[in-house]
Amino acid sequence: KGDPSVTTLTETPLLLSLLCIQFRHDLSLPQRKTELYRRCVDTLLRDWDASRGFRRDTAYAKLSDERKERLFEFLAAEFFSKGPSFTFPQDELFKLTGSYCERFGMPNLGGAELIKEIERHHGIIERSSMDSFSFSHPSFQEYFAARYYVSHHKEMEMLKTFHDRDICAGVIEFIIPL
């Protein structure tokens, strides 16, 4: 109610739909921003296709939800730490995704194929131009980057590096309650 970070989620049909699903489920929205985003991600990863009557049988669909979330965290933090950047050059994104999959023994997926499947499945990451991608909303990148920094015990390092940059306020807002 009146939270600008939540209000910005109403700017796109996909994100507005997620808020409506959350509200319909509980007849209210979570008070904590991190809880709202956690639920929205859960809905996208677990319920989005099912609610629309889809069942996909792809390599991406066979990845565990935890692996998917860890991949999003890794990509969000990688690109955030480089500037921070909310737009990802396609070639670099494909390369990072492929190396992440190899490093963690995930099914033999190419980075390009995996990102395209993510885009088709639920749109957490989407094409933003002919040769670049981004998270469907900057706040998703902030949320996943914050989760990465906290789970890897790098939140203090991030705060020391970026504390004076306004563009980092969103990540910091997510780090505090995590």
What spans do the regions from the language model cover?
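A ubiquitous short alpha-helical element
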Residues: 2-6, 57-63, 157-161
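Catalytic-loop motifs flanking and including active-site residues across diverse enzymes
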Residues: 15, 71, 140-141, 167, ...
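Generic preference for well-ordered alpha-helical elements
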Residues: 13-16, 34, 69
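Amphipathic alpha-helical segments of the small helical/lid subdomains adjacent to P-loop NTPase cores
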Residues: 1-18, 113-114
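Hydrophobic repeat-domain scaffold segments
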Residues: 13, 76, 88, 146-178
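Short helix/loop capping segments that flank catalytic or ligand/cofactor-binding pockets
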Residues: 18-19, 143-144
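Short, mixed-charge aromatic SLiMs
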Residues: 5-7, 36-50, 96-104, 163-174
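Extended helical regulatory/linker subdomains that flank P-loop NTPase cores
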Residues: 24-26, 30, 42-143, 150-153
